[in-house]
């Protein structure tokens, strides 16, 4: 994970710099895209395939998956707190929004991988579905509850 994180150039977040001149949608695309790229590296894909297949019978595999999910949720909470402070998005409950968002992104990634592995549908559809979700999420959590707000730049 740490090697994949390094290769994806994921580092400490300076939210002011990340947010500068970007819409909420652009920010979420950037953040989710980094996470997707990290997890699509060959070593990470192989690791996850093994962990996924073992987690229902091996406590250590389940623990690894739970810890990764907790890291993803924590990172999402931090992002959402920063987006709220910078008035980019507004959340009724930032913590639960982060859980919902992180789990949905994770589920969409899994869904896309399953379709790709099963040669059921092109991986491009996964990107379309993820982007549709990100657009919907921005509209639902716009500061003024106005779709146009997601187009405003910080």
Per-segment meaning from a language model:
Residues 1-5, 39, 104, 109-111:
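Feature detects amphipathic, helix-rich regulatory segments
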Residues 1-31:
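Amphipathic alpha-helical linker/stalk segments
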Residues 12-19, 49-54, 115-119:
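Short linear capping/connector segments at secondary-structure termini
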Residues 18, 32-40, 48-56, 132-137:
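Helix-loop "lid/cap" segments that line or gate small-molecule binding pockets
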Residues 22, 26, 38, 42-46, ...:
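Amphipathic alpha-helical packing segments from all-alpha helical-bundle domains
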Residues 26, 30-34, 78-85, 103-154:
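C-terminal peripheral helix-coil segments that are non-catalytic and often amphipathic
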Residues 92:
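Beta-hairpin "wing" of winged helix-turn-helix
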């Amino acid at each position: 994970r740490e090697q994949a994180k390094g290769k994806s150039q994921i580092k400490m977040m300076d939210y002011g710099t990340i947010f500068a001149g970007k819409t909420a949608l652009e920010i979420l695309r950037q953040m989710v895209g980094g996470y997707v790229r990290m997890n699509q590296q060959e070593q990470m894909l192989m690791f996850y395939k093994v962990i996924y297949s073992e987690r229902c019978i091996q406590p250590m595999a389940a623990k690894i998956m739970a810890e990764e999910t907790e890291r993803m949720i924590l990172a999402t909470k931090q992002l959402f707190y920063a987006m709220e402070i910078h008035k980019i998005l507004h959340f009724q409950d930032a913590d639960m929004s982060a859980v919902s968002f992180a789990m949905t992104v994770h589920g969409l990634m899994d869904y896309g991988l399953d379709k790709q592995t099963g040669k059921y549908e092109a991986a491009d559809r996964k990107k379309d579905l993820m982007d549709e979700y990100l657009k919907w999420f921005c509209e639902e959590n716009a500061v003024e509850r106005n779709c146009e707000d997601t187009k405003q730049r910080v």
